[in-house]
From Swiss-Prot:
Role: Co-chaperone for HSP/HSP70 proteins. It functions as a nucleotide-exchange factor promoting the release of ADP from HSP70, thereby activating HSP70-mediated protein refolding.
The protein's assembly and partners: Binds to the ATPase domain of HSP/HSC70 chaperones.
Alphabetized UniProt keyword annotations: Chaperone, Repeat
Protein known as: BAG family molecular chaperone regulator 5
Annotated source species: Gallus gallus
Length: 450
């Protein structure tokens, strides 16, 4: 319909709907909480549009009434979506884990403020645990949750990097203040760098109310300027010391732009990430090998070629760039386990086949050793089922497989090697295999996602 011939009220509704459409894009990617400033801003904007819609005069005309009703419903839908994004159980789970990390940082950050850089084991392990738990939060592919998880991980992983660098790498110096007049100044700057490191951790984790990223950037720039002004001509060891301290400052400066990076879509939308796409491409090839092996009745002829192909896939996975994203690291780890499981399946099938071929030689084996191989034969059949299984933990088949594997572990526990070293080694390997199959079954059904 020509806009020029439209009723003024319809025109006005179209204008409002256009503004609402612009707000909709912000609502879709909103990853904060209902207490955030951006939440309040979006809520006010949408409420204002509702008032604007309500004030449109319908003049009692049915078509205008219907248009106004549709516009109001769409705006109310966005208000509800905004509220749901902010109060989603998984979003609250992310926040709860982050608050634990904040409490940990507040407890452990004091040594930095005092100019030291000593990191205790509890701090390191606590941050590692937080990273792991954040990667396990299920987003269901929801953009707002993916973004919230990634933003939180970006901050916590930065803190993890900072404290790991303290724990693993001490500067080869400081030198004694008596070595050169400049050394005293460099040592005092290094002390300030340690304090800045503590401030940076506090800023990243949102536990500092006295500092800002801008102020910290100015402080770090000032420290570099102080170091540049020092006269260290002719003293290689002092020049190297200064260089090391400047490098420490540069490392801290790169973390100040993290929030902006965590906001970019390519970062948190891992479905479009190059490394994830590469992993998925490798997993697709793995499924083809898997399908061929499991569907072919006499697959022994395929074993050699399949193993070579699978080992090639492991090599390709080793080349995948992880960046600093623990979700990509976890995706690669899981893909490696999938490939290794299939290689183990082939190895066991080949070993069982050889035993059948040389049945006369195995007849004289120790009874306990034979018992272990009987269990290994059972495990091979169960492993084939586990590899094919595509259900979840509530499936009867899952519970049946879990029970079968537990029975095999109990059977191995009942085997008495009677001092036979070969039997001891075989039983140990069989137990490890059964545990790995159980772990793989659990991994397949834990509903992990990027």
């Amino acid at each position: 319909m020509d806009m020029g011939n439209q009723h003024p009220s319809i025109k006005r509704l179209h204008e409002i709907q256009k503004e609402v459409k612009e707000i909709e894009q912000q609502v879709a990617v909103f990853s904060g909480l209902s207490t955030d400033r951006d939440y309040k801003k979006l809520e006010r904007s949408l409420t204002k549009q509702l008032f604007e819609i309500d004030s449109v005069d319908t003049e009692g005309k049915g078509d205008i009434q219907q248009a106004r009703k549709r516009a109001a419903q769409e705006t109310e839908r966005l208000l509800k979506e905004l509220e749901q994004n902010a109060n989603h159980p998984r979003r609250l789970e992310i926040e709860a884990i982050f608050k634990e990390a904040q409490a940990l940082v507040e407890r452990e950050i004091t040594p930095f403020y005092q100019g030291g850089n000593c990191v205790n084991e509890e701090f390191e392990e606590g941050i590692q645990d937080v990273v792991l738990r954040l990667t396990q939060v299920k987003t269901g592919g929801k953009v707002s949750l993916r973004k919230a998880r990634y933003r939180t991980l970006t901050k916590v992983c930065a803190v993890q990097e900072i404290i790991e660098s303290c724990a693993k790498r001490q500067l080869s110096l400081p030198l004694s203040n008596d070595a050169h007049p400049s050394v005293s100044k460099i040592n005092s700057v290094m002390c300030e760098v340690n304090k800045a490191r503590g401030t940076l951790i506090a800023l990243l984790m949102g536990v500092s109310s006295n500092d800002t990223c801008r102020h910290l950037a100015c402080v770090l720039t000032g420290l570099v300027a102080d170091l540049d002004a020092l006269d260290v001509c002719g003293r290689t060891e002092i020049r190297n010391y200064r260089k090391e301290v400047v490098e420490e400052i540069n490392k801290l400066q790169k973390y100040l732009d993290l929030d902006e990076e965590a906001n970019s879509t390519h970062a948190y939308d891992l479905a479009q990430n190059h490394s994830i796409l590469k992993i998925e491409e490798i997993r697709k090839k793995l499924k083809e090998v898997n399908s061929l092996l499991l569907k072919t009745e006499n697959a022994s002829d395929l074993y050699l070629g399949s193993k070579a192909e699978l080992q090639g896939l492991i090599a390709q996975l080793d080349e995948v760039s992880l960046g600093k994203n623990p979700c990509i690291r976890e995706a690669r780890r899981r893909a490696v386990i999938e490939v290794q499981t299939l290689i183990t399946y082939i190895d066991l099938k080949e070993a069982l086949g050889k035993r059948q071929m040389y049945a006369e030689q195995t007849a004289a084996e120790h009874q306990s050793h034979k018992a272990v191989w009987t269990v290994l034969g059972n495990l091979s059949q169960i492993q084939q089922e586990v590899i094919s299984f595509d259900g979840n933990k509530t499936d009867k088949n899952y519970m049946r497989l879990e029970e079968l594997l537990t029975k095999q572990l109990l059977a191995l526990d009942a085997v008495d090697p009677q001092g036979d070293e070969r039997c001891k080694a075989a039983r140990k390997q069989a137990v490890k295999l059964a545990q790995n199959i159980l772990y793989y079954l659990d991994m397949k059904t834990d509903e992990w996602e990027y």
